[in-house]
A protein has these predicted regions:
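Short hydrophobic/aromatic patches at helix-to-coil boundaries
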Residues: 1-4, 94-100
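Amphipathic alpha-helical interaction surfaces in cytosolic regulatory modules
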Residues: 22-96
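Short beta-strand/loop segment at the start of cytosolic alpha/beta domains
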Residues: 1-15
């Protein structure tokens, strides 16, 4: 699992790759921690190379979404594979996020 966070053009861009499983969640959460603070910046989460997401990974994304909504910003999931989208569908989270 690799998680990277950058600020580009006034918004955050998080890139996730590999497997966001329970073992990787702590590291990913530490990298993405700034996104869980209300700051008013929109967030793009690039998932092109994300191969797997566990419930602990979903918990991190929900935390990011809650913080964004509290500050009036939005979270956009980008380039999400069909397999990962199916996880969002099965958990009922598909309608919570914007997908592009």
């Amino acid at each position: 699992m690799n998680a990277e966070l950058k600020e580009i053009d006034g918004k955050y861009v998080a890139t996730l790759s590999g497997e966001l499983d329970t073992a990787a969640a702590t590291t990913a959460e530490e990298v993405l921690k700034p996104l869980m603070q209300s700051n008013g910046k929109d967030v793009d989460i690039e998932c092109k190379d994300l191969e797997y997401i566990a419930s602990s990974g979903l918990r991190i994304l929900i935390g990011i979404l809650k913080a964004a909504k509290a500050s009036g910003s939005k979270v956009t999931m980008r380039n999400v594979s069909d397999d990962i989208q199916n996880v969002f569908k099965l958990t009922g989270f598909i309608n919570l996020f914007d997908f592009e």
